[in-house]
Amino acid sequence: MTSNTEAFDYWIRNDFKQMNTALEELYFAREDRNDVTGLGDDIKTRLLEEGRSFIKTLLDEGNTDEGFDSQFDLLGNVGFYMAACRRHELTNPANEHKSPLVEASALAMQLGATLGMIPRFSSAHLETHNRADAGVYKSFTFLDDERIFINYNTRAVFAYIRAAEALLHTLPLGVSHSVTYDLLVAARDALRDVNRFNDELFDKLDTDRFFYCVRPYYKPHKVGLREYRGANAGDFAGINVIDLLLGLCRADDPYYSQLLVDKFLFMRPEDQLVLRDCMRRKSLLDSFLESLATGGETP
């Protein structure tokens, strides 16, 4: 990281979160919690201008080629800033021909094109690739319910990934291999972990706080001329690997293939490669059926 990148990252982890938290407390105390107008305008202006200043400095510096991980992290920080501006109605794609965040759009598009991803934050920035400093990772606010939401989403995502990796390891072995059974058990156990994490999230999350104070940061917004949907917790390859290898979905199904095409650029490049490879593989369900049809002894 350059010193300017580090300064922006420090701001995202501290002042940025403090300003968002202060605004959320103002909104939540209001009778109409959806109405964010006319509250905390001084905080909104500070957030807008401080973020713009950091980003303009990075644009002027022009040296964002610090390696993939550093670029990916910087894209997340720019994306967090743009998402917060959208949440606080400092931008609104319904009223704009293009994003008014000119500097942020320019930097996000430069980074997105270099990385092969959409030019906004993705779920990986908050989940699987969200580095903690002294135990504290990046988020939009300091609210407990955002922390709970990110914690359990991240746990569930990694459980899905464990299940997907176990299924992928069965492919070179074949369905009749004795160790394939062990891998299927590992996949089953990982999916049970997903259910457990979802149940715990349901029990612990304040749904009002989540709906009014966390969910709005995932709204669609424009980057340059184009509007991009918000990040989705399913924007990683593992969940689709499970669908495809278990035969629950098919890559040649028009509806499902459209879903895959739409999400590709929301995933990190290594996930894109895994999913592309999986789309051409025979499902385990088809392999089991073929083994039975040909008289396989232990499918």
For the regions a language model picked out, list residue spans one by one:
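Surface-exposed peri-terminal alpha-helical interaction modules
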Residues: 1-299
